[in-house]
Amino acid sequence: MHAALAGPLLAALLATARARPQPPDGGQCRPPGSQRDLNSFLWTIRRHPPAYLFGTIHVPYTRVWDFIPDNSKAAFQASTHVYFELDLTDPYTISALASCQLLPHGENLQDVLPRELYWRLKRHLDYVKLMIPSWMTPAQRGKGLYADYLFNAIAGNWERKRPVWVMLMVNSLTETDVRSRGVPVLDLYLAQQAEKMKKSTGAVERVEEQCHPLNGLNFSQVLFALNQTLLQHESVRAGSLQAPYTTEDLIKHYNCGDLNAVIFNHDTSQLPNFINTTLPPHEQVTAQEIDSYFRQELIYKRNERMGKRVMALLQENQDKICFFAFGAGHFLGNNTVIDVLRQAGLEVDHTPAGQAIHGPAAVGSPAPPPEITSPASPAPATPAAAVPEATSATPTTPPEEEDPVLSPHLLLPDSLSQLEEFGRQKWRKRLNKHQRPRQFNDLWVRIEDSTTISPPPLPLQPTPSSETTKPFVKSSHQLQQQDAVGPTSSSAPTLGLLHAITASIVAPFLLHSLGPS
């Protein structure tokens, strides 16, 4: 997902606490005049048969689906093998994320945090819990959800979590996050549909590879980061800090903005930016160390590892059409997954909207959006060679019987995934100092352009993690076996998620970016 680093720089759209109408789909973009007017986050790997790279963002799929070009949907339909950053439908992914976040047995957050910091954190969480009823949408209430349940789904068991994960959890306790519960994010939606269509699915990363670097910060660095996070949230609540971008801006750029815009700048870390020229010198040193550590561990090493595993999967499936869906930030900027593939000799071209996709059942005709069905009743397999023509690019509303809180999108590494998408932007103090404190809505982390020394070019030498670890893959045969004994793996986590995220209260928050994510 850079001059001086300030603590986790949090963005907030300061507005009233009242629940407000959902903005128009597409982040207020105008409907495109033609397919060629759409943004395309699709790249084609030139081989026979072709393979595809598709850039996602971690927002409810209904906000972007109408703006995804038909040829991107056709590439997905034509593929037989679909891969994601993590296997979002595997209960192990969920339980591993939950375990990774917990303090050692017998320890609680109050035991490890300084007293003042702990109580500041608790006051902030109490505030969020108080605000959630006003953030909820009528649709959520109509489905029988209540505020305490939503809060516990995100923040449950927070006193048992490691401080670095609490920091990320706080960043996701926002009005936007609460209001989006109930609709799968784009990545998860594609994963669910791929399994329902009996495609072979898999992942190029393991949970531990995303989780362990976060736990690698030393304790003083973690305290610094958590303190800076709370300072930013407190400033937002006091009305003294404003942010240049929100999730709506991200959606708008994805749907109809500039693909090279700073909001998609991938020269970012997946954690908040910590540098600020007003910090004391010793804190600036700490900020630089954190920034450098995560830039290497969560951006450059990840892109190299992901690129190598893409190549391994292509080698193993030379006669298959493969579709790789990663966060868009992995394909934009410098030292990207695409750079790794090109340096290895593969030919990777951006595929504009409107350009025909050549493959089985995908020669020029747009494919329909995957039909949404209840996770409890998986759709029959849809062979790639029998894809009908599209009738509408608009997805239907998820069925009422689908429990929106227990949907697997709850378990995405949300803060990590969000941060992949955000470019670094400078913050500015509010000019009107006499303005009354405003409510804290749509809180997001933003990252500034760096003036620190750029890292060396992405190395291509084998690394233990990229060479010895094989990607997770689930074949259509395995999916058929699952059908014979119970629900498909895309539906099984619906209940498994709850168990995976209930260490002590019903549903602890698990962090995609995810990422990813």
Swiss-Prot record:
Q: Which UniProt keywords apply?
A: Cell membrane, Glycoprotein, Hydrolase, Membrane, Metal-binding, Metalloprotease, Protease, Signal, Transmembrane, Transmembrane helix, Wnt signaling pathway
Q: What induces it?
A: Transiently induced during 3T3-L1 cell differentiation into adipocytes. In vivo, down-regulated by fasting in both white and brown adipose tissues. High-fat diet down-regulates expression in white adipose tissue and up-regulates it in brown adipose tissue.
Residues with an annotated glycan are N227, N334
Q: Ranges of Pro residues compositional bias?
A: 366-381
Q: Which Enzyme Commission number(s) are on file for it?
A: 3.4.-.-
Which superkingdom is the protein from? Eukaryota
Q: By what name is this protein known?
A: Metalloprotease TIKI2
